[in-house]
């Protein structure tokens, strides 16, 4: 099927995870004739935008993420107001680690620079602050901030898609894109070709294909896109009887991150009563079309971490439930948000490599992608776009230089 001149779109978005859905919403809201394509069913569980919880935090060692988190917090609230239900559930954010851990000290510096209210605590103050629910070693510190919380991922993606439809966007799932070509007849814009032979015409195109973005960009432009998929395992642990309410979001338990080896993160009990999410930021490299489907998780260090951190109130014998997800990793764990360039110039925008920490910033990323497709200055809100350039890997394969080696925190075995 061909969609002829009268069916042209202003922007075609390829990939309906949280980033593509957020971008489609932004575009449609601004009056752009928008098409959002997804290769699988909408709200599928084969990528990176599903599940029951993601954290939101502003405590980054990299200062340039603060403005994106701050903007996203406002945009999450605006989208919730428009849709009429909640996907963001605020709570404290608590970061912890060795007192000499440079990345954790950079988190404190970020808070100070931006006036983000925070409290730095020693082990005794941490125990008092959380009434014994969290314990840290004597040589550790903890940093508590109010800008934290949980995002409901599947619900959030559905929200953006519903809002996009409400503003006139067209959504099609089970529509896998095979290639993107220049529109030779009109001399401008692109043709998006599907594996079924359909052709969609657009003035602009945004590619947010998640773990599949490297494969698609290689086909489209013949370049090696610096993003590689990784399969990770999310673990849920049972809270011991009588202590369940102490670890709930209503009980003011925080979202949290533990710096060092391993880098551990988690959320309070919300989606599964009586269970708390605690996982390692890591996993195993994979082909998104030939995944091992787990389990692939290192449990011994995580068991020990849980045993030492939660005052014996969480069963550390092993997780009672697990879920699989994919990260789309860049070498420096920073995003790629840029024009594809080459023959496509500024007509194709790419957004990928969100490296296991991008979901919280989806509203700002969607706004930026929409700005770029509409040729509006994308650096609004103080966002430093140079950090996300595709070209940064040309001079240095490792990408952005990090001030401290431990800022690239991924725990993953070397590829063979």
Curated annotation (Swiss-Prot):
One of its GO terms (molecular function) is sarcosine oxidase activity. Pfam families: DAO. SUPFAM superfamilies: FAD-linked reductases, C-terminal domain, FAD/NAD(P)-binding domain. Its EC number is 1.5.3.1. The modification S-8alpha-FAD cysteine is found at residue 325. InterPro entries: FAD-dep_OxRdtase, FAD/NAD-bd_sf, MTOX. Binds 1 FAD per subunit. Keywords: FAD, Flavoprotein, Oxidoreductase. It catalyses: sarcosine + O2 + H2O = formaldehyde + glycine + H2O2. Its cofactor is FAD. Gene3D superfamilies: D-Amino Acid Oxidase, subunit A, domain 2, FAD/NAD(P)-binding domain. It comes from the Eukaryota. Belongs to the MSOX/MTOX family. This is Probable sarcosine oxidase. It comes from Arabidopsis thaliana (Mouse-ear cress).
């Amino acid at each position: 099927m061909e969609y002829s001149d009268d069916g042209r779109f202003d922007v075609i978005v390829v990939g309906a995870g949280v980033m593509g859905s957020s971008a489609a919403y932004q575009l449609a809201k601004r009056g752009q004739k928008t098409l959002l394509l997804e290769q699988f069913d909408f709200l599928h569980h084969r990528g990176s935008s599903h599940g029951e919880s993601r954290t939101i935090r502003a405590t980054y060692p990299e200062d340039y993420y603060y403005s994106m988190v701050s903007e996203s917090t406002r945009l999450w609230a605006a989208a919730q107001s428009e849709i009429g239900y909640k996907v963001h559930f605020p709570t404290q954010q608590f970061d912890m680690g060795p007192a000499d851990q440079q990345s954790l000290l950079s988190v404190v510096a970020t808070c100070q620079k931006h006036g983000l209210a925070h409290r730095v605590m020693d082990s005794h103050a941490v125990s008092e602050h959380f009434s014994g629910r969290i314990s840290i070693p004597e040589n550790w510190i903890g940093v508590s901030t109010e800008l934290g919380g949980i995002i409901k991922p599947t619900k959030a993606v559905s929200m953006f898609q519903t809002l996009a439809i409400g503003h006139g966007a067209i959504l099609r799932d089970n529509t896998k894109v095979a290639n993107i070509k220049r529109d030779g007849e009109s001399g401008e814009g692109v043709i998006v070709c599907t594996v079924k032979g359909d052709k969609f015409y657009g003035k602009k195109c945004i590619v947010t294909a998640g773990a599949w973005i490297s494969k698609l960009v290689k086909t489209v432009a013949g370049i090696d896109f610096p993003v590689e998929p990784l399969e990770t395992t999310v673990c849920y642990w049972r809270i011991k009887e009588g202590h369940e309410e102490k670890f709930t979001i209503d009980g003011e338990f925080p979202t949290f991150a533990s710096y060092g080896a391993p880098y551990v993160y988690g959320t309070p009990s919300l989606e599964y009563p009586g269970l708390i999410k605690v996982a390692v930021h890591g996993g195993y490299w994979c082909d998104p079309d030939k995944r091992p489907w787990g389990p692939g998780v290192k449990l011994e260090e995580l068991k020990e971490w849980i045993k030492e951190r939660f005052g014996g109130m969480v069963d550390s014998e092993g997780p009672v439930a697990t879920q699989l997800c994919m990260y789309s990793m860049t070498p420096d764990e920073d995003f790629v948000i840029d024009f594809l360039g080459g023959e496509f110039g500024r007509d194709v925008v790419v957004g990928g490599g969100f490296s296991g920490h991008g979901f919280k910033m989806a509203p700002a990323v969607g706004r930026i992608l929409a700005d770029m497709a509409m040729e509006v200055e994308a650096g609004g809100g103080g966002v430093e776009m140079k950090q996300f350039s595709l070209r940064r890997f040309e001079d240095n394969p490792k990408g952005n230089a990090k001030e401290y080696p431990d800022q690239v925190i991924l725990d993953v075995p070397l590829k063979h």
